[in-house]
Amino acid sequence: MKIRLPLLALALGMSSPLVHAQMLQPGLWELTTSNMQVDGKPLPDMAFMLGQLKNLPPEQRAMMEGVLAKQGVTVGGNGVRSCLTPEQVATNDIPLQDPKSGCTQKITDRTGNVWKFQFSCPKAQGSGQATFLSDRELTCRH
């Protein structure tokens, strides 16, 4: 069984444009996704992607978790977890995407607690909107 690494990289990568020093607090963050679409096509939710990871042979799973861990990301709960240090938040250096994924992000508008963004990956592109509910919680539409 193959893990859908590009989808996991895409899901992780889409979160990084949402992070800004004035909007978020450092600490442990958990990314979960559901009902995500790219170009009108539904993507598997985080639970499905994590299930794919859990179904890998032990060596492949360890390798994937190692790749994520090198970026400060661990698998747990209902999503992936990443600890954001004060320095990462201050410099907007958030390790939530695989640098080899080829994805890029751009924040196109910041109005109050709502940010609009565009993303582009080798096999997908789109736009979205993040609404900051507090410095500890946000919602996102893609």
UniProtKB/Swiss-Prot annotation:
InterPro entries: DUF3617. It comes from the Bacteria. This is Uncharacterized protein in lpd-3 5'region.
